[in-house]
């Protein structure tokens, strides 16, 4: 009898097989004497679509809503049906005595495995592998500490409740809004509040009026002492009056006080912090950073589990620090690493905190030594960010003295603050500057003459627009960006980690760009006209993060076995009735700001111009029609002169390729150039790839709503 191991994806399945020395490879699984390892391909099973409950739901009709199934159904995803059949046959195999769930250790990973087991009708005992990295050592250690599957039943119930609630609310809200206003509109408990967060910041900036204010400083022996102000001076004349009073007067040093302080490095990375840092340094988008991290985690085995919300490590990891350091010897920081290897580390260090680690600890390097030449440029950059932060947190704190000098001139007090480094500590990793000392030694009671008096003009600044990095942080802390009437929800949002999860926020932002609710220009994220209308047309409950706070509060209770998941689902059904009825009874109108005078060749209605990832296309304004045609799109065809990608206008024989440098080619000229380049041997596949024929309506909510809507 053997144990069947169910991994989340093939790469992890292969890692487990390698760690357990399973060598007999078959189609969809790998076998050994004691174990068989198989895998999902992400989700193999998902929630059924509305039309799978009732074929009449294929047509979107307002009167059919809300669609509330008595019992939620699941279906096998058609494109992964072949792998599902393999997994099913292995689960039901008489020679398999138990199932070991080895999907990602978290709410969503639990859902991936349990939906498969439930669909198959598994009755065999379940065990759970719970690990944070997929190195050989971590896997082998994990198999020595397998947990009983029952210990994770509440986690599964919370995951299932979240999935079903998102389906019920998301499908109905999206269909209600779309059919009510005859427009492709999408709602969700995470995406709609995210639009609101951006809108609130945009309004703040638009309504901001800069104000001038003034400060005064005196110069004593080359050092500027600032006037201690009880208020902000908006009238320059007030400071000019003070200047007149203190001019040519003698001052006195009242106090010279030094205070020793220390600061630690910024915390170890969780996913959101790392995505922010990658955007700040390299302008890498959140999705790009996550994909790069996945490669470092799965393919190269260089970092621990990426989808974590923790900045800390558990106490039992203290013994793994040395071998992780030895791996980093392959980087340019080897001299610092050698110094650290000779030290001993304690679980009392600030980076260790069991209470602040739930599913996964912070992202840190594994014990695998990197082959730098095998990493892509992006992989190298992200790995180095993680390695640097890890090293900084193991190094000594930065020690410095804050020297404060208080002085008096007439009836006015002045202050000078100087930071004097004592020990660079972790700052030495990137900063080799020497300690700074004051060249003038101020003493208490010392009298001085003022060398210069200056009045400085300042202006208040508007807050900055969100970029992809800062928006992630705002989603993590929405209570800081939206006015919440009830302060208790601010606490809940802070405790639950905001709206969305570390794993889904990047997808949410990308989806909002694709559906044209948000746009980014020069790194500044703004709400489009469509986004503003979505907020105006949506029930207020869906524009506030309070709904997510309430959900998350209850989902966490379900995880702990303190709340009934079925009660939660019933509450979501009641909420959905309320939302749909509000939309149905609304008298507001939706205005297409991108309506053209081009008639739809299918139904005759005017078409809408929409932006896609690769260009622009025309889409029929009637969601039921679905007619679309390309206006222009970026291709992979390179200009023969400046080598930039060319844009395709039109189609067929009338198609024209244009470059920003002014070069133009017809379709026949492009075809000839392609043939000449490859001596006439151009496969259909290569041609397709070259001009990127894929046509897609990027802001279409239908496919998301009907397939695997993630709100």
UniProtKB/Swiss-Prot annotation:
Belongs to the type IA topoisomerase family. Residues 2-135 form the Toprim domain. Residues 152-580 form the Topo IA-type catalytic domain. Its cofactor is Mg(2+). Keywords: DNA-binding, Isomerase, Magnesium, Metal-binding, Topoisomerase. Pfam families: Topoisom_bac (PF01131), Toprim (PF01751). The record marks 60, 167, 175, 307 as: Interaction with DNA. It catalyses: ATP-independent breakage of single-stranded DNA, followed by passage and rejoining. HAMAP family: Topoisom_3_prok. Residues 186-191 are annotated as: Interaction with DNA. The active site is at residue 305. PROSITE patterns: TOPO_IA_1, TOPO_IA_2, TOPRIM. The lineage of its organism: Bacteria, Bacillati, Bacillota, Bacilli, Bacillales. Its EC number is 5.6.2.1. The keyword Cell cycle does not apply. Transmembrane segments: none annotated. Releases the supercoiling and torsional tension of DNA, which is introduced during the DNA replication and transcription, by transiently cleaving and rejoining one strand of the DNA duplex. Introduces a single-strand break via transesterification at a target site in duplex DNA. The scissile phosphodiester is attacked by the catalytic tyrosine of the enzyme, resulting in the formation of a DNA-(5'-phosphotyrosyl)-enzyme intermediate and the expulsion of a 3'-OH DNA strand. The free DNA strand then undergoes passage around the unbroken strand, thus removing DNA supercoils. SMART domains: TOP1Ac, TOP1Bc, TOPRIM. GO terms for molecular function: DNA binding; DNA topoisomerase type I (single strand cut, ATP-independent) activity; magnesium ion binding. This is DNA topoisomerase 3. GO terms for biological process: DNA recombination; DNA repair; DNA topological change. GO terms for cellular component: cytoplasmic replication fork. Mg(2+) binds at residues 8, 104.
């Amino acid at each position: 009898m053997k144990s069947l191991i169910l991994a989340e994806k093939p790469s992890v399945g292969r890692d487990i097989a390698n760690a357990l020395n399973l060598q007999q490879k078959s189609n969809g699984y790998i076998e050994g004497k004691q174990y068989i390892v198989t895998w999902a391909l992400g989700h193999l099973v998902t929630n059924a679509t509305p039309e799978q409950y009732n074929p009449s739901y294929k047509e979107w009709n307002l009167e059919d809503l809300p669609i509330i199934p008595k019992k939620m159904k699941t279906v096998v995803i058609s494109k992964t049906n072949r792998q599902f059949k393999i997994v099913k046959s292995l689960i039901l195999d008489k020679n398999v005595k138990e199932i070991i769930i080895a999907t990602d250790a978290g709410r969503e990973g639990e859902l991936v495995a349990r939906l498969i087991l439930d669909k198959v009708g598994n009755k065999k005992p379940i065990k759970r592998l719970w690990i944070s990295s997929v190195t050989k050592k971590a896997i082998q250690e994990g198999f020595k500490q397998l947990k009983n599957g029952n210990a994770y039943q509440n986690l599964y119930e919370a995951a299932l409740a979240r999935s079903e609630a998102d389906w019920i609310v998301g499908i109905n809200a999206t269909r209600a809004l779309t059919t009510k206003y005859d427009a492709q509109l999408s709602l969700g408990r995470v995406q709609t509040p995210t639009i609101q967060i951006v809108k609130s910041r945009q309004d703040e900036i638009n309504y901001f009026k800069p104000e001038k204010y003034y400060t005064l400083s005196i110069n004593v022996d080359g050092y500027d002492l600032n006037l201690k102000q009880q208020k902000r001076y908006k009238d320059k004349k007030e400071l000019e009056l003070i200047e007149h009073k203190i001019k040519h007067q003698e001052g006195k040093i009242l106090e010279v006080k030094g205070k020793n302080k220390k600061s630690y490095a910024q915390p170890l990375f969780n996913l959101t912090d790392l995505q922010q840092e990658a955007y700040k340094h390299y302008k890498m988008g959140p999705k790009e950073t996550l994909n790069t991290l996945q490669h470092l985690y799965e393919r190269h085995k260089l970092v621990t589990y990426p989808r974590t919300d923790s900045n800390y490590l558990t106490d039992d990891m203290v013994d793994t620090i040395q071998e992780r350091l030895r791996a980093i010897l392959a980087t340019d920081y080897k001299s610092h690493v050698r110094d650290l290897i000779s030290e001993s580390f304690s679980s009392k260090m600030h980076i260790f905190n069991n209470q602040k680690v739930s599913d996964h600890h912070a992202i840190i390097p594994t014990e695998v030594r990197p082959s730098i030449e095998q990493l892509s440029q992006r992989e190298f950059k992200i790995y180095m960010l993680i390695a640097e932060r890890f090293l900084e947190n193991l190094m000594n704190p930065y020690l410095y003295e804050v020297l404060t000098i208080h002085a008096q001139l007439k009836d006015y007090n002045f202050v000078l603050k100087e930071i004097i480094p004592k020990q660079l500590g972790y700052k030495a990793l990137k900063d080799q500057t020497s300690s700074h000392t004051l060249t003038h030694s101020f003493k208490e009671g010392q009298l001085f003459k003022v060398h210069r008096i200056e009045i400085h003009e300042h202006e208040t600044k508007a807050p900055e627009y969100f970029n992809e990095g800062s928006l992630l942080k705002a989603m993590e802390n929405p209570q800081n960006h939206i006015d919440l009437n009830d302060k208790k929800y601010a606490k809940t949002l802070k405790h639950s980690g905001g709206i969305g999860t570390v794993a889904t926020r990047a997808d949410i932002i990308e989806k909002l760009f694709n559906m044209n609710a948000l746009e980014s220009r020069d790194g500044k994220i703004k709400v489009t006209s469509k986004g503003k209308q979505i907020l105006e047309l949506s029930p207020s409950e869906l524009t506030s993060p309070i709904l997510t706070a309430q959900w998350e509060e209850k989902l966490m209770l379900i995880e702990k076995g303190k709340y009934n998941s079925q009660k939660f689902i019933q509450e979501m059904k009641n909420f959905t009735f309320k939302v749909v009825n509000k939309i149905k009874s609304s008298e507001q109108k939706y205005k297409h700001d991108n309506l053209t005078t081009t008639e739809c060749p299918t139904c005759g209605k005017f078409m809408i111009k929409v932006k896609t990832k690769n260009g622009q296309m025309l889409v029929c304004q009637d969601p039921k029609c679905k007619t679309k045609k390309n206006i222009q799109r970026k291709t992979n065809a390179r200009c023969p002169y400046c080598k930039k990608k060319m844009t395709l206008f039109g189609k067929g024989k009338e198609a024209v390729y244009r470059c920003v440098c002014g070069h133009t080619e017809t379709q026949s000229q492009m075809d000839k150039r392609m043939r000449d380049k490859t001596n006439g041997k151009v496969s259909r596949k290569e041609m397709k790839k070259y001009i990127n024929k894929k046509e897609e309506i990027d802001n279409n909510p239908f496919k998301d709503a009907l397939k695997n809507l993630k709100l």
